[in-house]
Amino acid sequence: VRRMLAELGFRSIDEAVGHAEVLDTDAGVAHWKSKGLDLSPIFAVPIDERGTRLPQRRRTRGQDHGLDHALDRTLIALAEGALEDAHPVRLDLPVRNVNRTVGTLLGSEVTRRYGAQGLPEGTIHVTLSGSAGQSIGAFLPPGITLDLVGDANDYVGKGLSGGRVIVRPPEDVLFLPEDNVIAGNTLLYGATSGEVYLRGRVGERFCARNSGALAVAEGVGDHACEYMTGGRVVVLGRTGRNMAAGMSGGIAYVLGLDPAKVNTAMVALQRPDPDDLVWLHDAVTRHARFTGSTLARSVLSDWPRRSAQFTKIMPTDYQKVLEATRMAKAEGRDVDSAIMEATRG
């Protein structure tokens, strides 16, 4: 690096900062896709209105992301009682699609004061009305519930960390929620814990890289549960193609699954066992209670028949680990050694 800097006339990387005039394209990586690209803005040297080169070669002003005016500032102020002494509060506010990452600053305040354990369940309950912008409920910690009456954009519950997000349409809608989209793509990306209940269909890559959260939706797009490593997912409707691609952990349950839509390279399709059905009944019951879902209620009202229509999507290696753990504990053997043996480690 020092030799290359010297060839350019610099003694250090610090001296090279801002000297765009020494940049050039590399003919060795020329590609037909790059034809027509105008790279002049990258090579531009700052000049004033008279064409004189400016001396500034570094950032001269910071970016304003508008955080001082974010909706969360209002939420933090209104939830001060809960933040001070964990006193339960209920808030009701409108939301617009320009309000992004709603709940994230509030959640960071909870974590700053109470640590990763957050607050007791239901301490802060926020009802929002309208269309939420991207990433509502991102990184939300325990103790906060965001109850959105309306719809949401992409990344709902991204990095969810113990909180609860509910998305449901207004009660007076004239359409069937289970046949319409309620939220966008890549929901619960990288979520570690918490719950999300969605009364309606959602977009693609639902629960990609989910590692511990519970999610219930009434239909999903392509690539659902992609690279999922933990948590549980319930889908009460149709799925898109390539479901469970790269899914190495966690469990998904789909009502009326089309097996052709599943990527079976790493998973097996099974019938839910009795323990699964007990858990499923509870999850669907919670979905009905939180969202008012008529679809969930219809499934519950005919549970003996409808429960038989669920398919369990189980990662094969994950099942080996669970079985090895169970056997090792029953026999008093070392669990880690049993897991290594079961997975050919």
Language model: regions and residue ranges:
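Polar, glycine-rich mid-to-C-terminal structural blocks
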Residues: 24-27
